[in-house]
Amino acid sequence: MKTIIVFLSLLVLATKFGDANEGVNQEQMKEVIQNEFREDFLNEMAAMSLLQQLEAIESTLLEKEADRNSRQKRCNGKNVPCGSNHSPCCSGLSCEETFGYGWLYKSPYCVIPSNG
C-alpha cells in the first residue's frame, strides 16, 4: 500500500511539473528548429561555394583537354616519302633525297638529319 501511495504521489508531481515545463519545451523546440534551418542554410551556402569551385576546376581541365586535342597534324615517320604531295615529316626528321630508295620512287624521304 505504501508503494502505491509513493508511485501515485510521484505521478501527481510529474504531471504537475510536466505541465509547467511544457512552455519551456516548446521554446527549446523552436530554438532547435531555428538552429536546424540555420545549419541547412549554411550547408547550402557551403555546397554552392563547393559547386562553384568544382565548376572552375572542371573548366580548367576542359581547357587543358582541348589543348591536348589540338595536337600536331599527321606527320610521316622515318623512311616514308615526303615532299609537296605528301604530309610533312614528324619532328626530329627532315625531308631529304636519299641514295637508297629515293631514286626508285623519285621522291625525298623522311630521315634523321645528317650532321654533314
Swiss-Prot record:
Pro-peptide positions on chain: 21-74
Cellular compartments annotated: Secreted
GO cellular component, one term: extracellular region
Expressing tissues: Expressed by the venom gland.
Residues annotated as signal peptide: 1-20
A Pfam family reported for this protein in Swiss-Prot or TrEMBL: Toxin_22
MF-aspect GO terms: sodium channel inhibitor activity; toxin activity
Record keywords, A-Z: Cleavage on pair of basic residues, Disulfide bond, Ion channel impairing toxin, Knottin, Secreted, Signal, Toxin
InterPro entries per UniProt: Toxin_22 (IPR012627)
Cystine residue pairs: C75-C90, C82-C95, C89-C110
Free-text comment on this protein's domains from its UniProt entry: The presence of a 'disulfide through disulfide knot' structurally defines this protein as a knottin.
Protein's job: Ion channel inhibitor.
Similarity annotation: Belongs to the neurotoxin 14 (magi-1) family. 06 (ICK-Trit) subfamily.
Name used for this protein in its record: U16-barytoxin-Tl1c
Lineage: Eukaryota, Metazoa, Ecdysozoa, Arthropoda, Chelicerata
